[in-house]
Each structure stands twice: as structure tokens, then as C-alpha cells.
Swiss-Prot record:
It comes from the Bacteria. ATP binds at K9, T168, D169, T210, G211, G212, M213, R214, S215, K216. This is Glutamate 5-kinase. The keyword Cytoplasm applies. It comes from Geobacillus thermodenitrificans (strain NG80-2).
């Protein structure tokens, strides 16, 4: 097997005992599997839940707290306990654990986005195991990832991972709830995540976690959009991750083995950059962007809204008001209003670096699957 870069996400239910406390035997099982993959030469990035689950007991809570303040306090205590456990276990196999606590704002700035990539890449080059969790102690609702499933998908995307492995206590996706319906059929492989699957998926199945099968499907959908294949399932023993990559995992495989991956810059434009305005384009420009791989020119712009500057990211909508994509503009809003509908040679004097395009193809991301019908 060629060297692969794999993001592994471990949920709270796969780390805790029946009372909700941190289970060191379960943690050791995961560490053994990751260490084995490292010994085989693979790059492994771990996204771990469990900070709140590890911390609420020592704080005196009988069960997982439900208030934001309670969860953040438990995370403050539990994160250090969780990392102590991981560091001690990985040290037994000769590997160093590295902690990274992230918030959603770390992805908004392109500079911080690039720095995060450089940091994780350097850790991998030096043989360390990056262990990532959301910084639950300081995150506010507007700046959260939602859960670690989505965080793992975003990390897998910008690291250009070969696969995202979502380890859970259920061995894959079913057409019904296997806990209540013994006739439920498991999907061994799915080419994509459909809206029907999302609608039928339930919420969290655990009292110690925030995610459920729906959140895993949303994460899988996001990872697939980046060009990352996904596995959702379970396993035990040191070879479980190797088995998963070899196609022998106990779960569901989603997506093609080696899809085309989205460039890191385009990931930032599509999913992380703040959107500063909206540009409306005519049908000709829509077809050029979606069907012919062209840049957006001033002649195709019919309306401009928002107070954006050159090099900001904006949404692009068609004449029906449907978002077709997102891109980084070479014109400030005030200047684009002056030149919309005009030829590029007349308009370029108002653009950043006198570029003829409003949005160059390299700074464009299509967000709509449908193509223009001819």
C-alpha cells in the first residue's frame, strides 16, 4: 500500500465508558491502531472528541452538562486530561503527540489557514501525531464548527487527505435504525450522500457526544466536495485502520477511491472566507462560468450589491437569484458598478492591477452542480 494521508475522527462514544468517563482501554486501542499505521509509513491526523466527557466527572457533574458554560468548563478540565492520556499512550510506541485547538475563526483568515497547514505538515514531517479538537472552552456559537465531524471534514480537505475515517459505535450506515429495526440493511458502499439520506438520518445517538449519523453524513458530504473519500464505521485492534484502507473495514465506504481534490486556495474561497457582497450575472456569463470554464468579465455583470473591496470574496448569482459560485474579485464594489456591462478593455483601468477579469477562473469555485441547459 502506498503512503497515505488519513484523517481519523474518534467520537466521544468510542472513547468513554458506560458512565460517560474516559475509558483508557478504548483510548489505547485507538492509539495502537494509529501507531501501527505510523509504523507502516502513513501520515495520520487525529481529530478527537472526549474533552467534555473526560472533564464533567472530575468537576462533579453526575452526567454530561447541558449548558454552554457547563460544557466549556468541563472541556477546560477534560482537554488536559485527554491530552495527558494520549501523550502517555503514544510515548509507549515512540511517538510524540501534538495538540492543536481550533476555532472556526482560524479558517476565516487565509494567512492563518496557510499557517495551520504549514504547522501540521511540519509536525507530520517530524513524525509527530497531530491531535486536533475544537477549542470548546472559548468557542462561541457563531464561531463553532458544529461538531468534530465537520471539523474533521474541513481538516481532511485542506490537508488533501486521501481518506477521512469517522470511527463511531455503529458499524456503518443503514437504511433504517439498526437499534430499533432488526431488518435494517447496511450500506457497504455509497457513491454520494443524497438529500433523502440526510432527511432520514437521526440526531445524536449518545449521551456523551454532540454528533449523530446526520452530522456524519453532512461531514462526509463536505469531505467528498473536497475530493476526499470517507469511511464511517467501527473496528478494534491495532490493524483496524489498515483494514479500513484495504477495503476490509466494518462500515460504509463513501465516494470514489481517488477523486480529484480541491486546491487549498479554492477551499478557502468556497467554505471559509467571509463573503462581502453579491454579483449578479447574465445567462451568457453563467454559461461561460459553469459550462466553458471561463473567467467572469465586466460585460456579464448586471448588478452589484455590498460594500466589498478588491480581492474580497463575493457570491455570484444568476438572473433567477440562484447562487452559482463564489470568487475573489479584482474590482471594488464602487468601481464595478461603474463598469458593469462594459467591455474589459474599457473597464480594466478600474480593476486591481488593471486585470481584465472581474473574477479570474483560478479564483472561482462553482457551488451549483447543475449546468446551464442549452
Amino acid at each position: 500500500m502506498k503512503r497515505q494521508r488519513v484523517v481519523v475522527k474518534i467520537g466521544s462514544s468510542s472513547l468513554t465508558d458506560p458512565k460517560g468517563g474516559l475509558c483508557h482501554d478504548k483510548l489505547l486501542d485507538h492509539v495502537q491502531a494509529i501507531a501501527y499505521m505510523k509504523q507502516l509509513g502513513h501520515d495520520i491526523i487525529l481529530i478527537t472528541s472526549g474533552a467534555v466527557a473526560a472533564g464533567f466527572g472530575p468537576l462533579g457533574y453526575p452526567t454530561r452538562p447541558t449548558t454552554i458554560a457547563g460544557k466549556q468548563a468541563a472541556a477546560a478540565v477534560g482537554q488536559s486530561l485527554l491530552m495527558q492520556a494520549y501523550s502517555a499512550q503514544f510515548a509507549q510506541f515512540g511517538f510524540t503527540a501534538a495538540q492543536l485547538l481550533l476555532t472556526r475563526s482560524d479558517f476565516y483568515s487565509r494567512e492563518r489557514f496557510r499557517n495551520l497547514f504549514a504547522t501540521i505538515t511540519t509536525l507530520l514531517e517530524h513524525g509527530a501525531v497531530p491531535i486536533i479538537n475544537e477549542n470548546d472552552s472559548v468557542s462561541v456559537e457563531e464561531l463553532t464548527f458544529g461538531d468534530n465531524d465537520m471539523l474533521s471534514a474541513l481538516v481532511a480537505g485542506f490537508l488533501h487527505a486521501d481518506a477521512l475515517v469517522l470511527l463511531t459505535d455503529i458499524n456503518g450506515l443503514y437504511d433504517a435504525n439498526p437499534k430499533t429495526n432488526p431488518q435494517a440493511k447496511k450500506y457497504a458502499f455509497l457513491p454520494e450522500i443524497t438529500s433523502e439520506m440526510l432527511a432520514s438520518a437521526g440526531g445524536s445517538g449518545s449521551t456523551v457526544g454532540t454528533g449523530g449519523m446526520r452530522s456524519k453524513l453532512l461531514a462526509a458530504q463536505k469531505a467528498l466536495s473536497f475530493g476526499v473519500s470517507v469511511f464511517i464505521g467501527t473496528g478494534s485492534g491495532k490493524e483496524k485502520l489498515a483494514d479500513i484502507l484495504a477495503g476490509k473495514g466494518d462500515g460504509t465506504y463513501i465516494g470514489v477511491p481517488f477523486p480529484k481534490q480541491m486546491q487549498m486556495r479554492k477551499q478557502w474561497i468556497a467554505y471559509h472566507a467571509p463573503v462581502s457582497g453579491t454579483i449578479t450575472v447574465d445567462s451568457g456569463a453563467e454559461e461561460a462560468l459553469l459550462d466553458r470554464g471561463k473567467s467572469l468579465l465586466p460585460a456579464g455583470v448586471t448588478a452589484v450589491s455590498g460594500d466589498f473591496h478588491a480581492m474580497d470574496v463575493v457570491n455570484v448569482i444568476n438572473e433567477k437569484g440562484v447562487t452559482i459560485g463564489r470568487g475573489q474579485v479584482y474590482y471594488a464594489a464602487a468601481d464595478l458598478k461603474k463598469v458593469k456591462g462594459r467591455p474589459s478593455e474599457e473597464a480594466r483601468q478600474y480593476s486591481y492591477l488593471h486585470r481584465p477579469e472581474v473574477i479570474h477562473r483560478d479564483n472561482w469555485v462553482t457551488l451549483r452542480k447543475e449546468r446551464v441547459k442549452r
